[in-house]
Amino acid sequence: HERTLPFEIPHEICYGKFGRYLGGIMGEVATGGYDLGIVVDPDVDRLAFIQEDGKMYGEEYTLVSVADYILDHVKGATVSNLSSTRALRDVTERHGCQYFASAVGEVNVTTKMKEVGAVIGGEGNGGVIYPESHYGRDALVGIALFLSSLAQKGVTCSELRKTFPTYYIAKNRIDLTPDTDMDAILGKVKERFGSMDDVQVTDIDGVKLDFPTKWVHLRKSNTEPIMRVYSEAATMEEADALGKELMDVVYEMTK
């Protein structure tokens, strides 16, 4: 069954607003007896799946699933950017391998992959980078590897999803004035949380605070006076609360 999907899909895949664009294919998969649905963006470098029950598989779990399949066959490092799900780290360590984080952006991910000799990497927006093919996000490669995993394990899409830890990512933004010194604010956030025993601070791209069971990542925009706040936890409510907590911290620092 052919599907014509609007070019705005990559942005919707990134930010989770699926209903407006993907409702049609989700309903078709759920009622049409399909094993899965496949969604790509116009330049075919981002990839998301629809489960056989019509639910979103989760674009963050595209890379996680493919990495799990690769690590079943070849042991090695994995890489994703700082704003991607912690599930990749969990799966990588489950295979006895090492996970590395890079700054956001495909070039930063591939640079880190080459540096550590990663066997698989990518971004949580559904971007899969498989060095055996080439150093670039490629949805077709991701599709082939994902289907191979389903076939090898003999499971449905929803059954495969249940084998991975579940996290939820909340995405917020802080609107600031053009004269706000965002670098100074990020420095204050790093200083404030850096002395805490249960927080790991990473500052290669904004400031990311890793807590034992959750994280929050603050990044400034290079084109407008806003700061993006991504946070992840075991529930969406907890993830959003963590993001809002850091937003309050930043707003307080601007007074």
Region spans (language model):
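Short Gly/Thr/Asp-enriched flexible loops that form oxyanion-binding sites at enzyme active sites
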Residues: 45-64, 88-89
